[in-house]
């Protein structure tokens, strides 16, 4: 099973964060009241969702490596995985949302959908194909119950 990309999702997230900071000066911005608090909230929420979901993988003694989904040994469906099939990527998106709010939000309207599209096409869909091969009907039922993002 080959993924459509060889760039780990945390690296993709960092690249998008750099683009948000770099391009934020070239786009109009909205100065929200309390933007520092709102942005910190989303950044911390993103870290919490990402790392608590990764901890679920460790508790189940299965791989957290997004580049090797075929090494997954257990289907994780508890914690944040009850509400989204991809809480770690959702956490990364929340982190980028926090950065976008801090940088005036408008630039995020461009980069956040690009991040979702990129991660979905190059990472999530190949991971789902690997999970279908490994877990079959169990993963199919999980896909019917729980949405890809939220």
Model-assigned labels for residue ranges:
Residues 86:
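Extended, alpha-helix-rich binding/interface surfaces that flank or overlap catalytic cores
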Residues 1-78, 90-150:
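Membrane-anchoring alpha-helices and their flanking helix-loop junctions
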Residues 80-83:
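Generic transmembrane alpha-helix motif of multi-pass integral membrane proteins
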């Amino acid at each position: 099973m080959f993924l459509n990309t060889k760039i780990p999702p945390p690296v993709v997230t960092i690249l998008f964060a750099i683009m948000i900071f770099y391009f934020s000066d070239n786009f109009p911005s909205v100065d929200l009241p309390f933007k520092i608090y709102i942005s910190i909230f989303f950044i911390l929420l993103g870290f919490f969702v990402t790392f608590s979901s990764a901890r679920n993988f460790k508790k189940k003694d299965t791989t957290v490596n997004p580049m090797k989904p075929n090494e997954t040994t257990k289907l994780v469906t508890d914690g944040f995985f009850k509400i989204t099939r991809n809480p770690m990527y959702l956490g990364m998106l929340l982190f980028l949302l926090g950065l976008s709010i801090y940088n005036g939000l408008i630039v995020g309207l461009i980069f956040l959908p690009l991040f979702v599209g990129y991660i979905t096409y190059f990472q999530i869909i190949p991971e789902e194909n690997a999970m279908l091969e490994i877990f079959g009907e169990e993963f199919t039922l999980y896909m019917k119950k729980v949405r890809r993002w939220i």
